[in-house]
Amino acid sequence: GFGSLFKFLAKKVAKTVAKQAAKQGAKYIANKQTE
């Protein structure tokens, strides 16, 4: 049904956002360490 599709999409988006956030965080930490 529609609910399960929405849940599936929400999970995908959450995973993508988490990946992006992890990348940004790693970059930020690396920049802080090189200062």
Curated annotation (Swiss-Prot):
One of its GO terms (biological process) is defense response to bacterium. GO terms for cellular component: extracellular region. It is found in: Secreted. Keywords: Amidation, Antibiotic, Antimicrobial, Cytolysis, Hemolysis, Neurotoxin, Secreted, Toxin. Expressed by the venom gland. The modification Glutamic acid 1-amide is found at residue 35. It holds the Pfam family Cu. It comes from the Eukaryota. Its main location: secreted. The keyword Calcium does not apply. GO terms for molecular function: toxin activity. Belongs to the cationic peptide 04 (cupiennin) family. 01 subfamily. Has antimicrobial activity against E.coli, E.faecalis, P.aeruginosa, and S.aureus. This is Cupiennin-1c.
